[in-house]
Every structure is written in structure tokens, then in C-alpha cells.
Amino acid sequence: MDNRSAQQYNNSIRLQPPRAAVPTIASKSPSYRGRYAGPYLNVARAAARRNGVPGDLFLRLVQQERGWNAQARSVKGAMGLAQLMPGTVRLLGVNPSDPAQNLEDGARYLRTQYETFGSWRLALAAYNAGPGAVQKYNGVPPYKETRNYVRIIWGN
């Protein structure tokens, strides 16, 4: 192949392998449009910032979890604003009833999932269904709840 042909080959979009889109902090995802303006909003923003989580993403997560209800408890035992599961609470050593700790450790746990899976979309799936489910299915698990959760928070 001569130099000109090689250059044409390198520049040909058709011949280049597809590039996977990997969501990053800079990826376009919907901004937070919730109506909540209470005392936990700035606490959640600060927790996201300290843990390297996109602020709007974390605000949408908290909104989706229990609508900013600090006393919320799910039927599965998840607690507080960030709906931390009992096992996660034990792992992180936090008081889930303290809204600031709950948000801080929710953001920290989400960041840990991002570091594990390399994608905010998969981090959200792991936050909802558990990291084992994301590993088992090598992506967002086929659970309706988890798929809806990721779609609502991530936006697609």
C-alpha cells in the first residue's frame, strides 16, 4: 500500500472499528429539574462534589430514591435520602439516619461503583441492583425496576 492509500485507509470512517460510547463526568445527561429546594439540596451537592460524582446525576438519584425523604425506609430495608442498604451501611460504617452521612456515603458508594464499572450508567445499575447483578449480566441487568431506574436518572 502506498503512502496515499494508507492515508485514505486511516481516514476512512467506514473502515475504522466502531468506538463504544463510554459515559464520563463530561457526558451529556439531563440536568436536575426537581422542585425540591429544602435543606438537603446543598448537602447533596457538596457530597457529590467531594466524591467526584456529577452533581445533577446525584440529585436525580436522591430524587428518584425517595423524593428527598430523610426518614424513608424501603420494604427491602434501604434507609434514608440515598436509600442505603443495610449491608452497604455496615460496609461503610455510617449512621443512615443522619442525612449528611447518608448523602455523603451514598455519593461515595456511587463513585465506588463508577470506579468498578467505568460508566455512570453501570454505576447506577449497580447502585440499584447490586454490583453482582451488573457483573452477572455484564451490563445493566434485565430487571424492569433497574432498567427504569437507570433510564429515569441517566436519561436514556
Segments from the language model and where they lie:
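Cell-wall glycan-active module
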Residues: 1-60, 156
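Alpha-helical segment that forms one wall of the substrate-binding/catalytic cleft
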Residues: 38-45, 49, 81, 86-136, ...
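Extracytoplasmic
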Residues: 53-56, 76-79, 118
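His/Met- and acidic-residue-enriched segments that coordinate or traffic transition-metal cofactors
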Residues: 73, 77, 155
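Secretory-pathway/luminal and periplasmic proteins that interact with or process carbohydrate-rich
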Residues: 67-73, 131-137
